[in-house]
Design a protein with these regions (language model features):
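Hydrophobic core of transmembrane alpha-helices in multi-pass small-molecule transporters
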Residues: 33, 101, 117-139, 329-346
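C-terminal ends and interior cores of transmembrane alpha-helices
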Residues: 96-118, 310-327
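Glycine-rich segments within core transmembrane alpha-helices of 12-TM secondary carriers
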Residues: 161-179, 373-383
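C-terminal transmembrane helical hairpin of 12-TM major facilitator-type secondary transporters
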Residues: 302-348
């Protein structure tokens, strides 16, 4: 076709409806895709890698999680160090740190042999996990502000929905890739505990994260600089902060030790763990809007009470299934409860709605939720340490009984919330 002009890429109509016409959002969305897949790859093998290759025992797993969660606890101070940076630059820094962390895990896996329990190896792996976690936590808040800034003013919510869905789909793709990699390696004779599978996964994850960091580096610099939140405590939010303590403590037990139970107690390999993570991600995508509507219809208080009452059963089944059922049946029950925990945890949105209803303005909402995350992380890192010790001396039955008790206390405390606490003119 002589003389024809090169056609400029035209983005889909539904994106034109959401994003401002002058904004080039392709690169930003592409970064989220790459980041999502890389995260899915890492998350899909992380616990098996620690248990089967690095030989991290249950008590040590709590120590690992303590350090991995420290960036979340210190996030408010980390962001304060970058107070002169626009959000786009903070986003680029976060991507670079994640790429460095993933590359470190790949290099470490390339120089060690199978089933190593050497202390220096454990230290290196934890350091690179913390580096990745630091980048991940840095990205969390600015990703949302960038997504909203690129959108038309009245379409900020739709933009957040698009970016969240893209991230979840990337995670699912990463989980399924892990399953495929270990399935193929198994077919050609490699055992689940052979390090070759982890090298392939971390290598692929490194390539994706480096690509994500390079793509992010090409993003247009913006002047957008969201205010770096300070700690905000007000008496009317006391119940919210206490609820966050119970939620964070109970959730941390599941987040840290539930995968380890499946691996050490039931022999789940990376393929099984990745399939479970993928199923959880699909259910989270499908159930989030439904639970959101339930909160609006039934009220945040009813959801706060109901979800934690269900979680009591989930926790007890997780801790005692191997005592009550045959190994095969117990494994199925534990897998179902693993998925249920992920679904029910979506109901923590009710806590955010509670804050919105008793806040006087949007700034108060943002400051309170940010402080709540910090409070959550304080107790999360402590419960991670304590949980590993409890497992090592008293077993998983005691550990998950404590989780059930925390859920029960959460329900009882949520029942004390009164309707008259709400601010009728809340934003």
């Amino acid at each position: 076709m002589t003389g024809s002009k090169t056609k400029k890429f035209k983005r889909p109509a539904f994106l034109d409806d959401i994003y401002r016409p002058e904004e080039k959002i392709g690169r930003f969305l592409w970064v989220l895709v790459l980041f999502g897949i890389a995260f899915g790859l890492k998350r899909g093998v992380q616990d098996n890698y620690l248990a089967d290759i690095i030989i991290i025992k249950p008590f040590e797993r709590g120590i690992v999680e303590f350090f991995r969660e420290l960036p979340g606890l210190l996030l408010i101070f980390i962001l304060a160090l970058m107070y002169k940076f626009a959000d786009s630059r903070v986003f680029k820094v976060g991507c670079a740190l994640m790429a460095g962390g993933m590359a470190g895990l790949f290099i470490t896996s390339s120089i060690i042999t199978n089933n190593t329990g050497v202390l220096i190896t454990k230290i290196l792996v934890v350091l690179f996990m913390v580096l990745f976690s630091t980048g991940e936590h840095i990205i969390m808040p600015v990703r949302c502000t960038i997504a909203m800034e690129l959108a038309k003013r009245e379409k900020a919510g739709a933009s957040l929905g698009i970016t969240t869905s893209i991230n979840q789909l990337g995670n699912i793709a990463g989980f399924l890739l892990v399953t495929g990699i270990f399935f193929l390696l198994g077919r050609i004779g490699y055992a689940r505990t052979d390090i070759i599978g982890y090298r392939v996964v971390f290598g692929a994850g490194t390539a994706l994260m480096v690509a994500a960091a390079m793509t992010a580096a090409a993003l247009k610099e913006t002047t957008l600089k969201a205010p770096r939140q300070r700690f905000y405590f007000a008496k009317k939010f006391t119940k919210y902060y206490i609820l966050e303590v119970f939620y964070g403590s109970r959730k941390q037990i599941f987040l840290t030790f539930a995968p380890y139970v499946l691996i050490l107690q039931y022999g789940a390999d990376p393929s099984i763990m990745s399939i479970l993570f993928a199923i959880c991600a699909v259910f989270v995508m499908l159930c989030s809007p439904l639970i959101g509507k339930l909160i609006d219809k039934a009220g945040y208080k009813a959801v706060m009470i109901g979800d934690t009452l269900i979680l009591i059963v989930v926790c007890l089944m997780y801790g005692f299934a191997h005592r009550l059922f045959s190994p095969g049946t117990a494994f199925i029950i534990v897998c179902i409860n693993f998925i249920l925990d992920q679904i029910i945890s979506i109901a923590s949105m009710a806590n955010n709605v509670y804050v919105q209803r008793i806040s006087s303005n949007p700034e108060e909402i943002t400051a309170t939720l940010s402080t709540g995350i910090s409070v959550n992380h304080v107790f999360s890192v402590l419960i991670a340490l304590l949980g590993g010790w409890i497992w090592s001396i008293a077993g998983i039955e005691t550990l998950f009984t404590i989780s059930a008790v925390l859920a029960l206390i959460n329900s009882i405390y949520a029942a004390t919330i009164k309707k008259n606490e709400e601010v009728t003119s809340a934003a």
